[in-house]
Amino acid sequence: QVFDQACKGVYDRAIFKKLDRVCDDCYNLYRKPYVAVSCRGNCYNNLVFRQCLEELFLGNGFNEYISGVQTV
């Protein structure tokens, strides 16, 4: 499921897919179920999501991802 009904912002399938991909990749890196769940918590607005961005070397696109988080 790409869309989290708890998110109250704009529904944009492309943004959700992009944010969800970060969490999927982070889970694949660590293989810990709590990583995937925590990463998606609070509509991606959390420390685990930000740490995943850094661990996946997506830091140079950090602002773009955070903007997506604020949108959803």
Curated annotation (Swiss-Prot):
Protein name per its UniProtKB record: Crustacean hyperglycemic hormone A
Modified sites of kind Valine amide: V72
One record GO biological process: neuropeptide signaling pathway
Cellular component GO terms, alphabetical: extracellular region
Disulfide-bonded cysteines: C7-C43, C23-C39, C26-C52
Role this protein plays: Hormone found in the sinus gland of isopods and decapods which controls the blood sugar level. Has a secretagogue action over the amylase released from the midgut gland. May act as a stress hormone and may be involved in the control of molting and reproduction.
Residue ranges of the TM segments: none
PROSITE patterns: CHH_MIH_GIH
PTM-bearing positions, type Pyrrolidone carboxylic acid: Q1
InterPro entries reported for this sequence: Crust_neurhormone_CS, Crust_neurohorm, Crust_neurohorm_sf, Hyperglycemic, Hyperglycemic1
Protein family (similarity comment): Belongs to the arthropod CHH/MIH/GIH/VIH hormone family.
Residues that bear D-phenylalanine: F3
Residues annotated as signal peptide: none
PTM description: Stereoinversion of L-Phe (in CHHA-I) to D-Phe (in CHHA-II).
Species this chain originates from: Cherax destructor (Common yabby crayfish)
